[in-house]
UniProtKB/Swiss-Prot annotation:
<dbReference type="Pfam" id="PF00534">
    <property type="entry name" value="Glycos_transf_1"/>
</dbReference>
<dbReference type="GO" id="GO:0005978">
    <property type="term" value="P:glycogen biosynthetic process"/>
</dbReference>
<feature type="binding site">
    <location>
        <position position="15"/>
    </location>
    <ligand>
        <name>ADP-alpha-D-glucose</name>
    </ligand>
</feature>
<dbReference type="GO" id="GO:0004373">
    <property type="term" value="F:alpha-1,4-glucan glucosyltransferase (UDP-glucose donor) activity"/>
</dbReference>
<comment type="similarity">
    <text>Belongs to the glycosyltransferase 1 family. Bacterial/plant glycogen synthase subfamily.</text>
</comment>
<dbReference type="GO" id="GO:0009011">
    <property type="term" value="F:alpha-1,4-glucan glucosyltransferase (ADP-glucose donor) activity"/>
</dbReference>
<protein>
    <recommendedName>
        <fullName>Glycogen synthase</fullName>
        <ecNumber>2.4.1.21</ecNumber>
    </recommendedName>
</protein>
<dbReference type="Pfam" id="PF08323">
    <property type="entry name" value="Glyco_transf_5"/>
</dbReference>
<keyword id="KW-0328">Glycosyltransferase</keyword>
<comment type="function">
    <text>Synthesizes alpha-1,4-glucan chains using ADP-glucose.</text>
</comment>
<dbReference type="InterPro" id="IPR013534">
    <property type="entry name" value="Starch_synth_cat_dom"/>
</dbReference>
<comment type="pathway">
    <text>Glycan biosynthesis; glycogen biosynthesis.</text>
</comment>
<dbReference type="InterPro" id="IPR001296">
    <property type="entry name" value="Glyco_trans_1"/>
</dbReference>
<keyword id="KW-0320">Glycogen biosynthesis</keyword>
<dbReference type="InterPro" id="IPR011835">
    <property type="entry name" value="GS/SS"/>
</dbReference>
<keyword id="KW-0808">Transferase</keyword>
Amino acid sequence: MKVLFVVSECVPFVKTGGLADVAGALPKELKKLGTDVRVMLPKYGLIPQHMRQKMKKIAELVVRVGWRRQYCGIEQLEHEGITYYFVDNEYYFKRDSLYGHYDDGERFSYFCRAVLDCLPVIDFQPNVIHCHDWHTGMIPFLLREEYMRNSFYAQMKTVFTIHNLQFQGIFPREILGDLLNLSDRYFSIEHLEFYGHVSFMKGALVSAHLITTVSPTYKEEIQTPYYGERLDGLLRARSSHLVGILNGIDDEIYNPKKDPYIAVPYDVTTIARKSINKRALQQHFSLPSEEDVPVIAIVSRLTKQKGLDLVKCVFHEIIAEHVQMIILGTGEWEFEQFFQDMTMTYPDRVRVYIGFSEQLAHQIYAGADMFLMPSKFEPCGLGQMIAMRYGAVPIVRETGGLNDTVQSFNELTKEGTGFTFKNFNAHDMLYTIQRARSFYEQKEIWETIMKQAMSRDYSWAKSAFKYNQLYDELMAGSGIYVHE
């Protein structure tokens, strides 16, 4: 089985979000199962110089972008057993950020065509092209409507993964002819038209052989108007070709037993050593080293989608529970400013780091007692899985992947890995924090919850097995896809 992953970002080369983690980890697990998986992404100017120096140019071609002809170089790099291909065009990709440019429609129209055009040139004929998010959404559409007439492409299948339905790649109608070389007949509700515009995401949803998303619950949610971002009707129509497969985490990177960033290594059998990491974290942030005061952590984008407005609404009540709070992230100015103000209001209780540091994130996971993630919606979420791996008990809203990964603690059976609430409501969240706080006082029960959380397997191995099944079933044409 030959699979080409096409992504707009990938660890360790360039990252803005969770997509990069998936693109970095899942191919490695698929390779362990015997799949010939390769990854293709743009050669951004932001890729570190030492990595760019290792790339080898293997092909040059010309790609159509409307009436223009644009240069395309293909560079190759072997990294940790995986072959990576980089689409090189400095005009499009040598920028100071990955996204958010006035010509993103043109940049990713070019990228989608470049991916398809280069395959015969580099002599790689994948069975499956696995595309991720809107940046690659036109690949399944162009393959179906144009490239499949060529025998080289005729047997290829496409899988499209929705990482976040909110970001859809919506552009003016003129993009069809000007950039995509497509006629106006495709500006229709059956094809690319989306409320008077062209949607790259919709292009993939109408044309991919199979659609996946990153958790079983999110798969169900996006078929409803509340979560469906105006695409719920289309997703319901394609529900027989829609599968939810939970993301994993890289359990080598996130391993408290071997983590080079934390003060003291520990695992589920030496869980008492976590308290040393807590003390180190408190000292790092110049907080009082109080063992009996729980540290609640937030490692997140500071946005309304992540539920930060709920936290803001009842922040004073949370601190009144006699807790310490540490926040790491960047986002909307409203929340950055609020949390910075709260460090002045509660100098012995609150710390915030506006920015992101991988090392500090690891130290927070290792030192925190609780991990707060009250998202409005969460396709999968990695933070709660990392937190459980480190014994930081998650407090989450029952949505998307949070619902699939965190089992709410049952005081009768003593089963569970965290605490959950259903409604997107600040006081429901506050009550859940208070409930967690009460069990924190019961050390034996709290240790049970921590151990149960740390014992869960959220590695990529299970997910990779399901994707491999999916590819096999797709190529077999059975029409019966993996059960979640």
